[in-house]
Amino acid sequence: MSENTTATTRARRKVREGLVVSDKMEKTVVVEVEDRVKHALYGKIMRRTSKLKVHDEQNSAGIGDRVLIMETRPLSATKRWRLVEILEKAK
């Protein structure tokens, strides 16, 4: 009569675009991501940046590259993002 269907659906992963600011670590790059936030009281649109550590398996990204990153499971104490693709190489 009653069916127990436990369909576990995975939540949508966050995807961000950012600029590589450091590539000094092995298989890790630091990406600066910009977020535009409206001030709660005054309504001004502000730019807020955050630096994220991103897993780069092939060590292919360099400083100044524009990259696409995706949220993933925790890979280390501070890494929760992985590199999806390099959108534009630095000149």
UniProtKB/Swiss-Prot annotation:
Q: Which Gene3D superfamilies match?
A: Nucleic acid-binding proteins
TM ranges are: none
Query: Superkingdom, according to UniProt?
Result: Bacteria
Listed GO MF terms: rRNA binding; structural constituent of ribosome
What would be one Pfam family of this protein?
Ribosomal_S17
**What biological process terms from GO does the record include?**
translation
What are the record's GO terms for cellular component?
cytosolic small ribosomal subunit
PROSITE patterns linked to this entry? RIBOSOMAL_S17
User: What does the UniProt keyword field contain?
Assistant: Ribonucleoprotein, Ribosomal protein, RNA-binding, rRNA-binding
What is annotated about its quaternary structure and interactions?
A: Part of the 30S ribosomal subunit.
Q: What does this protein do?
A: One of the primary rRNA binding proteins, it binds specifically to the 5'-end of 16S ribosomal RNA.
Q: Which family does it belong to?
A: Belongs to the universal ribosomal protein uS17 family.
Q: Which HAMAP family match?
A: Ribosomal_uS17_B (MF_01345_B)
Q: Which PANTHER family match?
A: 40S RIBOSOMAL PROTEIN S11 FAMILY MEMBER (PTHR10744), SMALL RIBOSOMAL SUBUNIT PROTEIN US17M (PTHR10744:SF1)
Query: What protein name is recorded for this chain?
Result: Small ribosomal subunit protein uS17
Q: Which organism is it from?
A: Salinispora arenicola (strain CNS-205)
Upper classification of the source organism reads: Bacteria, Bacillati, Actinomycetota, Actinomycetes, Micromonosporales
Question: Per UniProt, what is the name of the gene that codes for the protein in this document?
Answer: rpsQ
